[in-house]
Amino acid sequence: MKKSLLLLLLALSASTIMAADYVDEINNSAEKRSEGHRVIYEMNVGSFTQAGTFAAAQDSLDNLKSLGIDIVWLMPIYPRGGGINSPYAAKNFKQTNPEYGTIADLKSFVIRAHQLNMEVWLDWVPNHTATDADWVTSHPEYYATSGGKMIHPNNYGDVWQLDYNNPDLVNAMNDCLKFWIDEADIDGYRCDYISSPKIPASYWQTTIPMIKEYKSGKTITFLGEADIANDATRLKEVGFDYDYAWRFQSSLANYGTTSTSARLKAFANTLLEGSSSLSFGRMLYITNHDQNFNESKKTLTQKYGDNRYPLTVFAYTLYGMPLIYNGQETGGNQALDYFHDTKIDWNTKDDKMLNTLRTLFALKHAIPALSDSKTAAQNPAVNFLNVSGNSGVLAYTRTLGDSQVLVVLNMGTTDGTATVSGIDEGDWSLWLDSETIAQGTSRKQTTLSATQTFNIDAKGYRVYVRGSFPEQDPNTDTAIRDLPSANNKSTDSRYYDINGRVVDTPTMPGLYIHAGRKIILK
C-alpha cells in the first residue's frame, strides 16, 4: 500500500513539473519579430511618465520590450491648439509638443527603440488642424469653406476641415509624412479618422504607395482608424496594412460583465466571417484612448469587472494583431484624460494582468497558430469545440499546419466543470492558467483526451499549446532542460520547436532549439 502510494505521488509530481516557460526569453529576444507575430502599444507620451517627455519614455523602452511589445504607436506629438488641448488638434505637423521635447529627443527615442528591434509609429491627423494652426494664417486656402467661412468637421469647435480638393494641400500633407521619415526615421503611421467623407479614397490610393516607396530599404506601415471591413468599405483596396476591428470591440464593450459564452461565440463568428476575404490585417483590443476616456470614462474594471481577464485572452488569441493601451498592464484601473495628460500610476500593480499579457505576447511571438496575416486565407483556422455541462464555458482552437493552440474560458460567475469534446488528444503544454498566473509565468506538461473535463475557476482561463517538453521526451538522449541558454553545450542535433516537439528542418517562422542554441526563423 505504501509503495503504491509512493508511486502515485511520484506520478502526480511528474505530471505537474514546472519547466522553463521561455516567456522572458521570447519577449526579450534580440531578433526583430516578423510581421504576423507582433504586438502594438499605444503610448501617450505626456501620460506615460511623470516627466511626460520623450526622454523619460525612452528610459522605459526596455520595460516595454520585456512586456513583449514590438511597435510603439505614439499618440499625436504635435503642438496642441484649438482651446481644449486635444492632441488631435495640431497647430503644426512639422513640430513637436514642446512639453514632450524636441525633434532631436524624438529621434533619440526612435534610435533606442530600433536598438531594441521595436518600431515607432506616429499618430497622423489628416482630416483637420487646430483652429489656431499656423496654416490658418499662412495658407488659408488649405481649408474647406462654406459661404466663405472655414468649416468645423462634425461640429468639433477646436478644429478646421482641410480641403483635399486643393492639390497644394495634398502636397503639403504628403511632405509632412516624408518629414518624419527623414527627421526621426519613424516606421509607420496610425491614420486618424480615415473614414472622413472629406478625404477621397483616391488620396490614400496615391499617397500610401508613394510613402511606402519614399525611402529605399525602409518599410512604412499604415494603420487606418476605421472598420474598413464593415463601415469604410470604399477604402478596402487603397493600401492600408491594418484596420480596426471596431464592431468586434463594440460587441465586447456591450458584453460588459455578462456571464454566458454564447454571445462571445457569436461575436467571434461575426468577426471571422467579416474578415474572411480581406487583403489587410486587423487590430484587436479591449480598450484604447477612446474607450478609456472619450466614450465612457470607465476603467476596465468598471466596464468589464472580472471579465477583463478572460476577455483579454479572448481578444488576443482569436484573430489579428493585439493592441495594448498604456497602463493596461497595471490592470487598467484609471480613466486617463489624454487632453490633460493624466499620469499613469505605475505603483498600482496587477500581477495577474501583467503576467497574463506577458505570456500572451510571448505566445503571439513564438507560436504560428497565433500569427496573423494580411491574406485572410492564410490566417490560422479557428474551430469552436463542443462544450457541455457549463453554459459559461467557451473553448476553441487555432491551427496553422502542425501548430495548434487550445483556449478554454469560463465566463461564468462560479467555479465549475465543463466537458470539452473535439480536442486532438495527446501531449499539450499548459502555458497560461488563471489560477496560478498571478504568482508568475509557468509552463506545465499535460495530456488531454479527445473529450476532456476541465475544472476551471469563475472568470478563469487556460491556454494550451500542442506538444511536449524536450526534457520529458523519452527519446531525448541528452539532458536539455536548459536548451534556450546559448551556453548550453548540448550535442543533440535534432530541432525542437518552442513546445519541445522534435521537428524536421524548420519551415514555419518561430523559435527553435538546435544543438543547445536558439534558432529564430523569420
Write out the residue ranges for each language-model feature:
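Asparagine-centered strand-capping/turn motif at beta-strand->loop junctions
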Residues: 408-412
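Sec-dependent N-terminal signal peptides
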Residues: 4-13
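C-terminal beta-strand-rich structural cap/linker in extracellular carbohydrate-active enzymes
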Residues: 444-475
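Sec/Tat signal peptide C-region and signal peptidase I cleavage site
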Residues: 15-19
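Residue-level detector of functionally pivotal "anchor" positions at catalytic/ligand-binding pockets or at interdomain
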Residues: 468-499
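Substrate-binding/active-site clefts of carbohydrate-active enzymes
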Residues: 21-71, 76-185, 199-202, 206-218, ...
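Active-site-proximal helices and loops of the catalytic beta/alpha 8
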Residues: 22-23, 176, 182, 190-285, ...
